Amino acid sequence: MSDIAENMSNLSVQDNDSGATSGDSRRSYVPPHVRGQQRSGSGNYRGRSDNFGGNERSFFGNERRGGGYSRGGRGSVNWGGSNWGGRNDSRGSGGYGGGNSSGRWIDGKHVPAAKNANLELELFGVAEDKSFQSSGINFDNYDDIPVEASGNDVPEPISEFHSPPLDPLLLDNIKLARFTKPTPVQKYSVPIVAAGRDLMACAQTGSGKTGGFLFPVLSESFSSGPASTPEAAGNSYIKKVYPTAVILAPTRELATQIYDEAKKFTYRSWVKPMVVYGGASIDNQIKQMRYGCNLLVATPGRLTDLLERRYISLANVKYLVLDEADRMLDMGFEPQIRRIVEGSDMPSVDNRQTLMFSATFPSEIQHLASDFLKDYVFLSVGRVGSTSENITQKILYVEDFDKNDTLLDLLAASNEGLTLIFVETKRAADSLTDFLIMEGFKATAIHGDRTQGERERALSAFKTGRATILVATAVAARGLDIPNVTHVINFDLPNDIDDYVHRIGRTGRAGNTGVATTFFNRGNKNVAKELVSLLSEANQEVPSFLTTIMREASSGRGGARGGRGGYNRGNSTRDFRRGGAPSGGFSSGGGSSGGWGNGGGSSGGWGNSSGNWGNSSNSSNSNSGWW
């Protein structure tokens, strides 16, 4: 990693004699879990191996341009069948669950299934398999991350995984996943949810937010058992499912990722997870529902569709989770979310727990989100700015016409790991992918215009190392956890600084280190001020050209920012009920601290939010490509 940063620090974007496009021989990155397997060709980027190059389109098959190297493989979606409560499942007399790897609920007790060595290997891998990334060399630094929690009677944080408050079976699964201790967001979210409180959690990317809601929800589910099906359920010719936990995510990829994590932590339990999203066969999803669903991961559009078809009832929902909640609301999913929360048979806000997680919560989004919460705790983990010091951020001044050549120089300096490149448009993603393939790189693309099958195959190829470069639009920017991404490149800098935060957070996750490189020119001056602030807060180098352009923009435009709705960056990780005040409330200098520190002497909450802000007038139109 240090080699990458060092090579980049010596990079001159004006130097066209770097040899980036020469026929150099470079070693192809092979993930640890596929090393030693038979490979065809030399594995040389420039050597046109594995059908990359030569006949550049030979590996596209019937896919459209931008397909790159995307053969199917491990990582394909399982719709809840097989060993996770599908066709092998059965309901025995007096019990709930069954099957080869499903536990049962019998006479008020949870009876876990027997261990399954093959399934454990598939779910959790082995300790040396870095494709199952858990924590890195800087994981212990999380103990020093500042934490602020505001609200009435905030519960004390935990310092380690133990029972109570966590269920013993869940602890076994956490150990199988090689999670040795909770991250700061998990230290606080577990007792907060266990206490029956609603939660709005803002934590930097790669900090364990998925475990932050899965652990407490599953722990309670394992202990309390399934809810009884309403008597009226048998009066319909359509067999409905009655999940007790619903997790909403903005994209298909994030929903699938959450589902994959849920499969790990529901191993041997009675809880049957399932995922539904648009772009895949709704008939197949309906068929899988016949085998039961207790924890449902869904995108808003597909869940709305299934509700209208009356295949799902939300009457038994105890937990509603909105992951990347700010993004869902900002993307225009508010009508679907309101239809799900307020227009269905879901219990009212007073009769369920609602949890919202994201890396950023601008105050305007907090106002809107408070409609769905009651007496909630606002949790802010990490410094305002929400980027990790595990990520080395590099800003290069690159004019648009120089971007391709500069990109080749960067890729030549990156000797190992996976590279994720972000562009702004779908057309740019396809064009850049084709360019990289022509240059001999193993690249593929993911964006909203590709079919779901193409997107899944592209992600599979990238995760397994068959494609070492993934070119993506914002569809992959939020929440995705792809192991071994060592370099993120913002080929196009987004207009919103929060999107920048989420993009670079695809590397440097769970205490691992990473590099994020951004191409900047005067066309991006509207975000210069906040970019300087972000770099300074994360102890990163601020190039002189960026400071100069920031001053130019401030003098000419009064320092106003572009992007969505003109949000104030300073409030994106602070409870809006506090009026943006930096003092007061509860705070901790680190996630492991058992006390709340001296937060200004306040012992109470910050008042009750009225929550009735109505519909957002500035939400963007919903794009069906997201759901």
Swiss-Prot record:
**What positions does the entry give for ATP binding?**
203-210
- Record field: catalytic activity: ATP + H2O = ADP + phosphate + H(+)
Q: Which EC class, in a word?
A: hydrolase
Q: Where is the signal peptide?
A: none
Q: Which GO terms describe its cellular component?
A: cytoplasm
Quote the SUPFAM superfamilies the UniProt record gives.
P-loop containing nucleoside triphosphate hydrolases (SSF52540)
Enumerate composition-biased segments (Low complexity): 76-87, 609-627
Which parts of the sequence belong to the Helicase C-terminal domain? 406-550
Principal place of residence: cytoplasm
Start-end of Gly residues biased regions? 556-568, 581-608
- Region annotated Disordered sits at 1-96, 553-627
Q: Does the keyword Protein biosynthesis apply?
A: yes
Short sequence motif named Q motif, residue ranges: 159-187
- What are the Polar residues biased-composition ranges? 7-23
State which Enzyme Commission number(s) the record gives.
Answer: 3.6.4.13
Location of the Helicase ATP-binding domain: 190-379
**Which keywords fit this entry according to its UniProt record?**
ATP-binding, Cytoplasm, Helicase, Hydrolase, Initiation factor, Nucleotide-binding, Protein biosynthesis, RNA-binding
The record places the motif (DEAD box) at 323-326
GO molecular function list: ATP binding; ATP hydrolysis activity; RNA binding; RNA helicase activity; translation initiation factor activity
Cellular location of this protein? Cytoplasm
According to its UniProt entry, the function of this protein is described as: ATP-binding RNA helicase involved in translation initiation. Remodels RNA in response to ADP and ATP concentrations by facilitating disruption, but also formation of RNA duplexes.
Name the family the entry cites. Answer: Belongs to the DEAD box helicase family. DDX3/DED1 subfamily.
- Stated name of the protein: ATP-dependent RNA helicase DED1
In which organism is this protein found? Kluyveromyces lactis (strain ATCC 8585 / CBS 2359 / DSM 70799 / NBRC 1267 / NRRL Y-1140 / WM37)
Q: Which gene codes for it?
A: DED1
